[in-house]
Amino acid sequence: MIITFGTQKGGAGKTTLAIAFANYIACRTENTVRGYDYDFQKSFYGKWLEDEQEGKFPKLYDVEIFDEQKNQLFKDLDKILEMKESNEVYLFDMAGTLDRKYSDLLIYSDYIIIPFEYSDVSVKSTLVFRNFLGLIESESERIFIRSRYDKSYFYRNQEEMDIELSKYGILLKHPVYKRNILQKLNTRELNQQQKDAVRRPFDELLEIIGKQYNIQYKPQKKSEKC
């Protein structure tokens, strides 16, 4: 399966959630994860490489820099079909910008995970990204996830935004709450606090994916990191 974390603009916690979800799948399931950093900032790969050099914990998965100039992955239809039909997770962290060079990735992804906030800037960029997916005729399943959600704050535009997004994809019921612990995330583990911060939305996400792909869960103790 091909899963892409994408937005039109940075700042919604896209890479943090991509890393957290890659970790969560690797920790919770037997499914192999392969990470691809398609963002020009290379934050995902940079963090993975930093963790690799420190060597404190065994790696959960490999991450590659995806260079569209050298890598012809999306020009090989047989390889694309192999990825889409596999129960392995090919997870892409896309750049927070709109460019035609990302069209193939967005078209061939099985799931596009779109983090958003209820700020005016995030709302506008999310709607622009939604329109772009329509423009390139992407038929990928679109899954919207609330990021850095503050449950103590009243979002005046939440009801209207939720209704609008639900017309174009699946809006996860559970948000990822604003937690400082997620800013200390690495690519090698999820401690219990980090798991608690993402458990509900990610379990909801895995349930959706599990309707199409075979998700094999590991037996796990609550005290385990990963």
Task: Describe each model-derived feature in a short phrase.
Residues 101-120:
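Inter-motif core of Ras-like GTPase G domains
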